[in-house]
């Protein structure tokens, strides 16, 4: 008969056990005994809750230098990330990587749109000259999706009515540029219903301006903007020359998007992909000129002489640009890219939902094994890792993070959102879906229109651009509409916070430390256990993942 012990001694008796319940991560991922695992093959055991989910911090590094507040990235696929996705991912605390299956100028323009979207002091505002027409101002508003353009030039005389004087007393010495005399501001209301589009903006611009002097701090400028009730606050030097601009809309964005991934300058963080081809050196120059912060060297097999050479060239040519290299799945691959100078690593080969590399090439690795092996090695050099692929749900994101990844990259999970560039259509079943295709699919590799007739990013990524016969490593299909990421990403963030609360850790560093020292434990899942862990035994059900 079992002896009944004093219940007050339960915590002391627990110490008699040689180890905690469940498995250490190294035991879990011992491929000699278990084979290589992926996310569905295990669970994380719960810990002790001593804090609220809202107190969980998800701050994480994506490269050696850059930190974001939500460990989520959107994939550089042509049906996932263009400027709209990149903007909203950054606003929500993550990072969007703009795809490169387009002409370099188009990709640079997307980067430029991200960098212009939200700013503190706008150091390179769009500035109009006095000769700009109302029609041209409307075109600029449509192009940049904002209104309120400063008008600058050099004048000898302004009339008492605030309008430019007649041509005989007005001398335009300089086009509208920064560091020129501020003459006025053209707002959306000034041009919206103006009936003569050929009129110069000087005929409609506002000249009664509230300005702040150069040297004003951001906090002081924000206060002036609030009290003035104006949409824009020009910053001028002692001579009245425009030096920068502040926008009221950006103040509102700061309120609505407190987690936004921003630089000290308040510009949104922006990443974009390039291939390993020499031709993309010109592409990268255009991206850097547009304001790029992070470059992702995109290849299905990252440990190549081409990628190593590209990393070294980028490091020597653009030392201020951080590099995320990949894709890789082994320590050996990681070592080569770290030695070349990579600031971050992207992990995954054949695990993406639209990828068939493992099936066709017989090369790759299950994602859980890949993430743990590479992340544990890279951590010794302070290099963050990004788990890319194999993510089918929120739980998979948490598992990728628990195995050592600093962040998780998503393709299909985001392809169905409003902000992705894929096309909506109604499926044969009457369901609203969005087009989604792997970058190794024949649909991408033979798409000359998307790349503008230049190098095809899909073919380049899979080393197939010179092949007479294209071997597909991906498929094209569709994903169900998910609505906007402004609702979906906050759901993911809240879910990760609740998961870490269940595990008993308050931030990602504590999660990684707990996994490494054995305090965070794991359990294998049999096929029956996986069935048990999903919805079962019901006649019917509705699976609604979140409400807002």
Swiss-Prot record:
K(+) binds at residues 350, 352, 355, 528. Pathway: Purine metabolism; XMP biosynthesis via de novo pathway; XMP from IMP: step 1/1. NAD(+) binds at residues 298-300, 348-350. The keyword tRNA-binding does not apply. Its cofactor is K(+). It is an enzyme of class 1 (oxidoreductase). One of its GO terms (cellular component) is cytoplasm. Residues 527-548 are annotated as: Disordered. GO terms for molecular function: IMP dehydrogenase activity; metal ion binding; nucleotide binding. GO terms for biological process: GMP biosynthetic process; GTP biosynthetic process; self-resistance to endogenously produced metabolite. Mycophenolic acid (MPA) is a non-competitive inhibitor that prevents formation of the closed enzyme conformation by binding to the same site as the amobile flap. In contrast, mizoribine monophosphate (MZP) is a competitive inhibitor that induces the closed conformation. MPA is a potent inhibitor of mammalian IMPDHs but a poor inhibitor of the bacterial enzymes. MZP is a more potent inhibitor of bacterial IMPDH. It is found in: Cytoplasm. It catalyses: IMP + NAD(+) + H2O = XMP + NADH + H(+). Residues 539-548 have a biased composition (Basic and acidic residues). The keyword Repeat applies. The active site is at 355 (thioimidate intermediate), 461 (proton acceptor). HAMAP family: IMPDH. Homotetramer. PANTHER family: INOSINE-5'-MONOPHOSPHATE DEHYDROGENASE, INOSINE-5-MONOPHOSPHATE DEHYDROGENASE RELATED. This is Inosine-5'-monophosphate dehydrogenase. It comes from Penicillium brevicompactum.
